[in-house]
Structure formats: C-alpha cells, structure tokens
Amino acid sequence: MVFSSLTFLFLFFPLVMGVYYLCPRALRNLWLLLTSLLFYAWGEPVYIRLMAASILFNYLCGLGVAALQKREKKRLAKGLLILCIAGNIGALGLFKYADLLIGTVNNIAGSKIALLELALPIGISFYTFQALSYVIDVYRGTVAAQKNPITFGTYIALFPQLIAGPIVQYKTVEEQLSHRRETTAQFAAGIGRFTIGLGKKVLIANQVGALWDTVAALPGTSLSAGTAWLGAIAFTFQIYFDFSGYSDMAIGLGKMLGFEFLENFNYPYLSRSITEYWRRWHISLGTWFREYVYIPLGGNRCGLPRQILNLIIVWGLTGLWHGASWNFLLWGLYYGVILIIEKVWLQKPLQKAPGVVQRLYSLLLIILGWVIFALTDFGAIGNYFAALFGAHGGTDAQTMYLLTTNISLLLVAALACTRWPAHAANDLLARLPRAAQTLLRCLFYAAVLLMCVAFLVGDSYNPFLYFRF
C-alpha cells in the first residue's frame, strides 16, 4: 500500500485515524503497531515475520546491552552490540546483496552458483537503520532502553515512515512515543503537509517520470544531446518530488498522530556546492552515516589521508545502501570524490565565485549523478554520458517535440524546487484576515486533493522510487 493510492486515502487512512482518536490514550500505541503491521503486510505479507523478528531481536538486544552496561560488564555489552549489528546487517545483506555478490562471483570466476532470488522486503534498509541507531544509542548511554515491547514495536513499524523514511532516530521521538499530546493545530498542519506531499508526488513526480521513461526507453547510441538532457533533468525532478513528497506525507501523517519528525529535505537544488547539497538532501540518511559511521571512523579529527579514506568508505556504503547494483556504488563514490575535491581544493574558489556559478556548478554535477543512479548498466551509463555531450548531435525533431509538450511541466517543477511558491503564498496570506487565510488554505488543499484523486483514478503510473531501497 502506498500513500498515493485510493485505498490508503479513502480506506486505511480514515479508519486508522478515526479509531486512533477514539482509543484511550493507553491503547493508541497498540493500535498504531497493529495497523502499521497491517500496512506492511498489505504489500509484503510474506515478510511480516521478518519485521516481527527484527522488532523482537532489537528489543531484546537493547534490554541486554542496557543491563550489561548497568552491571559494568562493558566487554559483554560491546560483544552483544556487535552481535546485534551483525544480525541486522546480516539480514539486510542476505535479502538485498546476496544475489549481487553471487552474480559478481559467477561473472569473475565463471562459476554457476545459483542465485537465491529473494524478493527484497520493502523498507528493510530504513527500518534496519532505525533499529541499529536505537541499540547503538543504548550502548552509548544516549537513550534508555525501551522496556515496553509495544512502544518499541511502534517505533520500528510506525507506518508513516516505515517503508521510505525519513530514518527516525529513537532519541528524537523517545518522549513522543510515551507522552505525546495531539492538538487540533498540529492535526491541521499535518493535513496540509500531507496534501503538499501528495501533490508533489502525483501532480509533478509522476508526470515528469513519464518523460524520463520515454527518454530512457530510446536507444542510447542514437540519443541527441538535447533529448538526453531533457531526460536527465526530468529524472532529477522526478526523484526529488517523489522522495521529498513521500517525506512530506510521512511528516504530515506523523503530525496528525502527535509526532514531530525531523525534516528530510531543505531545497537541495538551491545548493551552492555538493557539500551543501548533502546537508539538504535526504538529511536523515546523511545524519545517520555521520553519527554512526563517519565519526566512529575518526571523522575530521584525524589527518587528511585518513579523512579521505573515511569519506570513501562512507560514500561507498551510502551508494550501496541505495541498491544492490554496482552503479549505486559508483554513484556513491562519484559523490565521495567530489566532496574530497571540494574539501581539499575547491572550497575557497567556490566561495569566491558568483552565486549563479555556484548553483550551476552544483546542478550540473547533481544531474550527472542522477544519470549514474538511474541506469544500472555501465554500458548504458557510458552511452548516455556520450549522448549528453553531443556524440549523436545536438538536437533533433524528437527533442523539440518532447520540449514543447513538456515545457510547462518542467517550468512548474523548476519553480517548485525553490522557496518562491511558499514565500509568495505567505506574503499573500499575511495581508488577509485570519478567517480568510484559513478559508484560502482549505480551498487550496481541497483543490490539490481533488486533482490528485482525478489523476490517480485515470493514471496507472504511480511508483515510489525509494521503495526499492
């Protein structure tokens, strides 16, 4: 089940919210846990046992680590932590990376080891990282172990962020899990945030995604530069509005349930460097890798050679986290190398450059990076890059057709990547009486919702890209 589906909007969502607010406060976490497991089982019934096992395993590990720390048995606590990390990474590796490893060995050694062909459990990368952050923080003493299995299960399985994030660290919601207070204002803000996210997904991401699919289906060996750039720009818009739209919906649903999740995006395409970009894009993932991998490796506290090694490790892992294909590793290393270059050589020159140059530099590298991300075959990546830089001509009739039929959509997408729409709306509303502000907001959200429903009824194209990870 996805948020941008009629089943969720008109069946699951009203049922969950209605019963949630009718439940006594003491039973609300239990209701959320049960409905979150139902939400997960709707699309992955076979892996509901894996989810339950993950909850139980990490719950017991957290209690065990805390008990051993309290008794000052630090070596045993560390051993249990290592076991917990190995168990989580082992499960993730089995389902996500086993066939990649087997296929690579077969290609190199000429062997014929049978692939496992295990279906990837939806959201396993997200909920595994949440569980790991919890147990590591218990070991560090940052948070207390959660003794209530229902509360812990709710943290891991909470449906708004279960299958595509944001990656919610336990320490950011520890108090909210037990003592949240829902308010009318918070619920209203949640509806607005959810509706904006739904609009991003259905009205923009799905539409520009169709343009990317059209271009990606063309032979890369005869693609004109203009068409190739149109496709790459379309995918750049698609993945942003797809993923940030999902994050908006997750944050909005959280608000309706009394939770305040941290932001996951901050206008990343306005960045003036790649370093800044990764502070604005998928913030929860970057924070996770910084706190649980980069800093433990030494971070910036060691010499430059070690810092470079740390960055290569972190960005290689970041790439592989996104998928079981070598293009994701290449994509991660691509950014790792750029970040190293910026850190060592480009930081000061970039700061002195005009703002427009900084932004064009960043956007160019971001768009090229998404080409590596989108195409799993190295040969296809090479052909597409050749097309981008004019190997098969500049523009052709197809370029002009795709441009003229999609120009309005692309301009809307570009504008929606900026702060201007929010600033313009706020400036307009600030001039009106409070009652008029409320009325206009309600009318706007209703219009967006109606348009989304109309598109969902008539359009079968509704993928969430990050569900693959």
Q: How should each PLM-predicted stretch be described?
A:
Residues 1-468:
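Membrane-embedded transmembrane alpha-helical bundles that form the catalytic cores
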